[in-house]
Amino acid sequence: MARRARRPRGRFYAFRRGRWHNLKRLRRRYKFRHRRRQRYRRRAFRKAFHNPRPGTYSVRLPNPQSTMTIRFQGIIFLTEGLILPKNSTAGGYADHLYGARVAKISVNLKEFLLASMNLTYVSKIGGPIAGELIADGSQSQAAQNWPNCWLPLDNNVPSATPSAWWRWALMMMQPTDSCRFFNHPKQMTLQDMGRMFGGWHLFRHIETRFQLLATKNEGSFSPVASLLSQGEYLTRRDDVKYSSDHQNRWRKGEQPMTGGIAYATGKMRPDEQQYPAMPPDPPIITATTAQGTQVRCMNSTQAWWSWDTYMSFATLTALGAQWSFPPGQRSVSRRSFNHHKARGAGDPKGQRWHTLVPLGTETITDSYMSAPASELDTNFFTLYVAQGTNKSQQYKFGTATYALKEPVMKSDAWAVVRVQSVWQLGNRQRPYPWDVNWANSTMYWGSQP
């Protein structure tokens, strides 16, 4: 006989097969009987195309000896890209570079720590810095500066992809580390993060909430679509086969990108095998021979395009993404925000513990903190964002584009995201010296010096 329990407003529960079941009785809130609206059908329809949480089960793992909860709260600005044009930038095509209003926000502890960097007179808000952060000093050698930071390097153009969302974010961390600025004035590495956590490990990711609002119009129709995905289920495309051919994360297309017949083989695939994010080569109508005669030809120039691919507006919409309309196209209210909530580890295997510092490591170095030893940069969830427009390039599939421009004294954000995240660290070690130093008292048994 199943145990039963009653709750207010006619809710009825029964305990069987190890858990409580809601019997879903009709509501008793109103005078007349109303059947419950079948809202789950709409959710089931969306999950048939994309399920952000395919399911999980709990694994019986030992609870930590002690825990510490870490909270993050802040804002992320999704801005348009900037460029510092030089003669050597993209082979002289710096004036013809275009970007798309896309973004990718990864939920991992590493990028949340980078988003809560120190705020100094040289802030990380506004994009990449020309060099590593300089707290004080103006000498050319690193050893002559405090705290031993490098000056901006010459002949380098600062750049970053839209996946580096933490560069345009302001995040607060609780509890705070009062010695973080003096210990890590520069951008923290995995080695620095491992030293800051010490013996703590990531026990679980509790919850992360996103609230996205479109802030800029792009014509008469420009909603911002956002979709939350589990882990790296929809990650960028990467070919290690051509790893030596896409330095600086840029590549050049070759024929037959435009559908023509090439007279030589290239490293690109035919048109039927290209994914939609790859742009076609712009055609060249006229050319000049060695004798100075201008002739017409059937050739095409090589288009520069980024190796990092993102979800287009049409793709996100087809997968059931939410839309947020900018002010002017819809009145601003709570419904103007896209709300996303990520709970748990986002892992169908139910794994809870994650290694921040490899076990048995006395001196934390970069070699120990590299993958797969450390899981600081393990992605639990990923939020994909793209803004649509009624006028776009065909291979962008409704995604808004813009021309890269020189930096000005203000940034141009097309969306803002409010973030709240809760993490929990754990420690398995018992705080007893006779347990930790057991080997020191027993290593000489039977052979005392």
Swiss-Prot record:
UniProt entry tagged with the keyword DNA-binding: yes
Keyword Transmembrane attributed: no
Keywords, alphabetical: Capsid protein, DNA-binding, Host nucleus, Host-virus interaction, Late protein, T=1 icosahedral capsid protein, Viral attachment to host cell, Viral penetration into host cytoplasm, Viral penetration into host nucleus, Virion, Virus endocytosis by host, Virus entry into host cell
A GO MF term: DNA binding
Positions of region (DNA-binding): 1-43
Any single GO BP term: virion attachment to host cell
Subunit structure: Homomultimer (Potential). Interacts with Rep; this interaction relocates Rep into the nucleus.
Homology family: Belongs to the gyrovirus capsid protein family.
Protein name per the record: Capsid protein
Organism: Chicken anemia virus (isolate USA CIA-1) (CAV)
